[in-house]
Amino acid sequence: MGLRATSLHALRLAGLLAGLWAGNAAAISGNEQVSLAGTGQFEQLVSALEKQAASEPMKVADWHALCYSYFRIKRYDKIFSCLDQLDKALVARDKRTRLFGLDDATPTSLLMRAETFVEIAQYSAAIDQAQRAIDWYTKDGESEKDILAQALAVQAIAYKNLGKPDLAQQAAQKLEATQVNAYTDLAIGAKSLALARVNMALGRWQKALDALASDKTLGLRAFVDNITSGAFLKGLNNWVWLELPRGYMQTKAQFELGDIDRARAGFDKLLDVPQLAANGEIYWMVLSDRALIASKDGDDAKAIAFYRKALDVIERQRASINTEANKIGFIGDKQDVYARLVALLFKTSKFSDAFEVIERAKSRALVDLLASKSSFAPPRAAREEKLDIVEILGQQGRYDAALGQQSEAVLRSFAGGNAPRENTLKLALPAELQSLVSVSALTEAEIQKLLSPDEALLSYFANGNSMYAMVITKDSTFGTAINAEGLENDVRRLRASLAKRLPVETQLKQLHTRLLAPVESQIKQRRLSIVAHGALHYLPFAALFDGQQYLAEKYSLRMLPSASVLKYLRPARTNDFKAVLMMGNPDLKNPAMDLPGAQLEAQALAKDLAGSKLLLRADASRKAFIEFAPQSQLVHVASHGEFDATNALSSGLLLAPDGATPGRLTVSDVYQLALDAEMVTLSACETGLGRIASGDDVVSFTRGFLYAGTSSVMASLWQVDDDSTTFMMTRFYQHLRTMGRGEALRNAQADTRAKFAHPYFWASFYLTGAY
């Protein structure tokens, strides 16, 4: 069954494959449902049950089977609404299920919600749902200790991921104290797996092994089930779905404990199991760990091959957020696979290959960010072709899931009956949308074709204490490793010094020495596009200082979320803006949040820019933005901004509310807009000085406006003094009349620097998108 089944009801696998309850015939019979689920064909089960739901009433057992199938294939767009239907059915109908042969589906609904919340990093909600399952156990199901074990495991893992180790430890102790008889209690298997998951999450590898070993009757139960279900006579093993995650956890623990020989043999044995390929999350982790061992063995070629295969498995799946990995408590970081492969490719001087993997990693990060989002505004090409973007996203997700299950029949059904092709659905998407829903990084050669002769691209890729910098020009590629130890703290200290307007020249010079000096000899061009990564998203590159000049004095700069976005940027058509939306100092119903300087800024700029629609205070609302921004060539917003490092799509601009409707314009909202703006300027926004996170929040906000149809976005890394901001914005728009956007920003920064010398005043603004 795979990791999900073991997470919910490991000891009821026999009930899944052999135990059916008597009931009336359905559109798809109970036997067929059990057979499809037991063989992992969840896409086919979903298809059949969705047709049934559209044509006739569904029993609790049917809703449970459908929800569980969504749960298995990561249909985040449908799982919660399905569970809502299941909960409604549970109020008035027979509560029994076919899958797992449960008398009451209530706790499984709660646990599926809890597990899904963990997957999408909503840990507080996961803890709440798990507690409701515990409450159900206390009230109605004290014999159902597997429910208690799984709920406590969810809480322990969620608390750990929330950074609350004491509460995680408390949940782990409650789980460990749960009394089960090692030889007679059917919940021993559930407790064993739950303890193993928790101990892996907490990095307690020996305890994870001990937990797995505590289930002393697994072999006997598997043998009995294979006999009673008839699998033995067919040469099948129903329990391979339980044995795979147990085998992975055991081998992973051995590896982490330094037993490399046993781990190597264990991973090789797992790779020989045909069903492993149908469990994508475990599959990529096995491949990644096997690559690590090959690397330790000194076999770089084999390690590279394993890593490439792991990436193929990862990228075949629809974007997901730590799916199976959370279920065993070990957060298998997909980005580590990219980073380790990049390190090996650098080691073997395969810089072109390394660059492409770096681009795939950054593309994947964006896919993961958008994984749980199902509503997008069509990009320009899609609007013209009248494509149903949400439906295409759903088709792409189902197709990717089918690929992950390795089911030829399902693949053929999505490929129109022909042999499956990975790009069948992807080819139906506009290029702009392809970059959002699939890993479609450009190659080095494709990037070089997009660069102008006077432009260089500088791309960084960070992972832990390792960092790699690559310079790509029209006709050359250069790469080098950089020591990133302490870099995040250096950026944090710089930001703190900037906020206090302390002397920063020494810090800026040190950062220049670390980040630019190793590559600057390769940069002969005047224009420089920088692709930051990690903490570097919060670094004001314009202010880096070589002892003589700031970087902004030497180059016309722009920031890009990835090099591959070059293909999708809309070129600047004009800087002579005829329709301007100017919003400033929205009334947030809190005097402490007023920005009188932003209001003066908006008023001054509106006078200088013909055709401006000026909206201030209560008029500067979210509703007004959504109404007027699509009609504007230039959108300038001078307001507060809040960036959520834990949930980038919730980051937003604080605009005036409309009655009871909040005024927050989120990144998620931006992805649903249909703009045709030449430029969006976000003035007075701040990411929060001193806070360094993954950087995805900064990327996602600017990329959201690019996706919505904006050619260029100018934003700030921190809130700046009112006078200097107004001065700089005025100079920027004046320079735009005679030069490109990158040069206009560079010259506006120079003008501001002459009047306000400290980098705090002039270095916060950066350009993304078209020059």
Where are these regions (language model features)?
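Flexible helix-coil transition and linker loops at the boundaries of alpha-helical arrays
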Residues: K51-P57, K88-D103, D135-D146, A177-D185, ...
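N-terminal leader/linker segments that initiate helical-solenoid repeat arrays
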Residues: A25-A65, D104-A105
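Amphipathic alpha-helical protein-protein interaction segments
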Residues: A190, W239-P245, D268, W284-M285, ...
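"A position-specific structural signal for the A-helix of alpha-solenoid helical repeats
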Residues: N31, A65, A105, M112, ...
